[in-house]
Amino acid sequence: MARVFIYSPHPDDEVLSMGLAMLHYLANGSDVHLVSMSNGEAQGVANTLNGTANGNPVVCSTPADHPYIHSPAREGYTPHTAATIGDARIKEARAALGAMAMVPPVTPGVLGTVTHHVAGLPAEYGAPGSGSSTAPVTPEGIAAAKAVIKGFVDEYPNSFHYTMSQSDDHHDHAACGFALRELKDDAVNKVPWADITYKQALVNARFFVSRLYWALSQPDGQYPPDVASMPGLSWFNYYGANYDRYCDWMRNQVIDAYRAWNPAAGAYGIGYHQVPTQFTRCFPPAGSAEKIANLWHA
C-alpha cells in the first residue's frame, strides 16, 4: 500500500488545506502519516479561553457560538497557558485523524491506516522571535522544518510527501514549503538514479495552497503574488466520483474535532476559536456555491 506523509505546520492545517486529499488516500487503502510539525502553542487563544489578558476582559472571538467572556471557574477547567493550548490542539488533530480513518473504503475491506507523529518544533519556528506570523521566513526556520521532513524521507524512501506551499503568507507554513521544495529540487537535480525510490518519493512531492489564497481574482483577495505563478497549480481531483461523500464526511464528521466544546474531556474548540471564518469558508453547508476542495501545485 502507498505510504503518504502530510506535514501540517500546526494542528488544523491538515484539515483546512489537505483534508480531502487525506480522505482520498485513506479511502483507497493508503497508510497516511500525519506529522504535526508543532503543537501550535498560542497565548492569544489562551487569553480568550481564560477570559482575560493583562487584567482586561477578553470577549470570545466566536460570537455566533457564544458571545460572552469565558470563565474557567464557571465553566469548570483550569486556566490555560500557551503550553496547555498546544497540548489541546494536538488532541484535536488526533481526534480529527481518527474521524478521517473511519471514512468508508472505496473497495470493501481495503482499509487505510493512520499514524500521528508530533515533531515538537517550537512555536513560531518559521521565524523564531519575530513576534508576527507574517514575518519573512528565516533560514533557521526552513532548516528546522527540513530536518524533520528529511528524517521521514530517509526512513521511508518509497513514499509520498505533501505540505503547505512556500508561497503561504504564514512563516511556519512557508518554512515547510521551502523545506520540502529544497529536498525535492535536490532529489531532481542531484540524487543519482541508483537511488530511485528516494528520488521518486520527492519528485512526486506536492504543495497545498491555503484556502486564504484561493480567491486570486477577488478584490479583497490578499495573497502572496507568486502563488498564481506556481508550476502545476491545479485542483486535487483524484477523488472523482467520491467527491460528495468525502465532502460530507469532512463537514459532518471530521471538523467536529476542532469545534467540540467539552472541557471535562479536554475539548475546547480551539480550531474554531482561532480561525472560525476559515472553517466556515472551507466547509460550507451542503448545496452552497462554494466547494470543498484542495488546491495544490508541483
What kind of region is each of these model predictions?
Residues 211-271:
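A conserved mid-domain beta-alpha-beta active-site/ligand-binding segment of alpha/beta enzyme cores
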